[in-house]
Swiss-Prot record:
It is found in: Cytoplasm, Cytoskeleton. The variability of the residues taking part of IgE-binding epitopes might be responsible of the difference in cross-reactivity among olive pollen cultivars, and between distantly related pollen species, leading to a variable range of allergy reactions among atopic patients. A motif (Involved in PIP2 interaction) lies at residues 81-97. It comes from Phleum pratense. It comes from the Eukaryota. Occurs in many kinds of cells as a complex with monomeric actin in a 1:1 ratio. This is Profilin-4. Binds to actin and affects the structure of the cytoskeleton. At high concentrations, profilin prevents the polymerization of actin, whereas it enhances it at low concentrations. The modification Phosphothreonine is found at residue 111. One of its GO terms (molecular function) is actin monomer binding. The lineage of its organism: Eukaryota, Viridiplantae, Streptophyta, Embryophyta, Tracheophyta. Pfam families: Profilin.
Amino acid sequence: MSWQAYVDEHLMCEIEGHHLASAAILGHDGTVWAQSADFPQFKPEEITGIMKDFDEPGHLAPTGMFVATAKYMVIQGEPGAVIRGKKGAGGITIKKTGQALVVGIYDEPMTPGQCNMVVERLGDYLLKQGL
């Protein structure tokens, strides 16, 4: 299966009538492997900050997490594995695998729990595949 198929079929899938606003699979260096049409372009320093937070959980909490200049308040995730952010009525979930970052961005009416489920399910699958 291509990386684009993972985004189209597993991240942008319908959950209880709702979809993520955008999604992508990135390399740890920020290289885009596949993305949905509306996915924002990360700046290199944003990826650096995200990777540092995986290595040093809590690094982003004081400043927030920036994604294409949009600021997300970092909320409880899983240290070293998942970063979650909130911005207004939406948010972001980032799951780290051995080689990739699986990213989902949502807006209402999708819930944070639905976004977490979609992103983390694919991330867990990729981890089991050694990716």
